[in-house]
Amino acid sequence: MERANRMSAANMIRSLLPLVVVSLLAVGWIAFRQGDPDPVRPIDPTSTVQLAAARAGYAVQVPSELPDGYRPTSARTDAGDAVDGAPVTLQIGYVTPSTEYAGYVTSDDPGADPLTDVLDGAEQEGTVQVAGEEWTRSTTGRGETALSREEDGVTLLVTGSAPDAELETVAAAIAPVAAR
């Protein structure tokens, strides 16, 4: 009979209660420490840009000295596979101050996928002057603005869901990559 009293439901609850409290405290502490409100993870595109600049047969230009709030989140190039004289394409993606996307592409291959994916089927809407350069303004099939221009056989493209003013800020910041 004494054994039956020791195994009552009340005794079981009293035994488990400290475990439940400790578990809830541990879960709450972990959740609190991981509660980063900004999911954007900026990257440093320098190595990708330098690789493209070293392998390209043209003077690579990229957005530089962008104002606060423009954070690079992706960078890729096909320069790692390029042989002498082969075309080189460089792409850099940014999150803008309005938390929208702005993408930059430069390539000496007019048929490069990152260019054709945006420009094929885009409706040209005229030109716009940005930092003394004339850019063709288009609307893509997804309804996004695309600013493009060609310079010495190299296409420069700025596009994305960001407002036009932010895309123009990216375009205005484009400058040649400094040789290292």
Located regions from the model:
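A short, solvent-exposed beta-edge/loop patch
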Residues: 31, 124-180
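Charge-rich, low-complexity N-terminal segments
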Residues: 1-73
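Residue-level signal for functionally critical sites in structured catalytic/ligand-binding pockets
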Residues: 11, 19, 32-33, 92-95, ...
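Generic detector of leucine side chains in alpha-helical contexts
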Residues: 16-19, 24-25, 51, 66, ...
